[in-house]
Amino acid sequence: MRNLSIDIESFSSINLSKSGCYRYVESPDFEILLFGYSLDGGAAQVVDLACGEKIPADVIAALTDEAVTKWAFNASFERVCLSRFIGLPTGEYIDPASWHCSMVWAATMGLPLSLEGVGAVLKLDKQKLTEGKDLIKYFCQPCAPTKAN
């Protein structure tokens, strides 16, 4: 394994946009719900952690293996979240040296800073699903109680 592409979906009662990544991850109820990955450009795999599935041991080992290049859109967020997931103490994080951020690469080319925006500008065949955004909001963000819920 030389390259590991990663995408996670997570939950925390802390508002990410108001509080930032570190406070979001430090919340006692923080959890990674879904872990999507691809090894060396192969087929994408999704591990449903919320339903008890486990990330393969070789993939967990690759997270801290400097010989494996990790790719993610907003890699800093994924790296900090995964640091907590693998049990590093608060304030200690996976070394960023072998991580590459496709959001930063997009920004250097003048592309939008959202995955949805990059896909639209580049007219990619596979776009981020708008339905997915609604589902992420429903499952990954706390909601205020209403009569309906």
What do these predicted ranges mean?
Residues 1-30:
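Entry/capping segment at the start of metal-dependent catalytic domains
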Residues 30-32, 36-37, 41-149:
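Active-site-proximal helix-loop-helix substrate-binding element of RNase H-like nuclease domains
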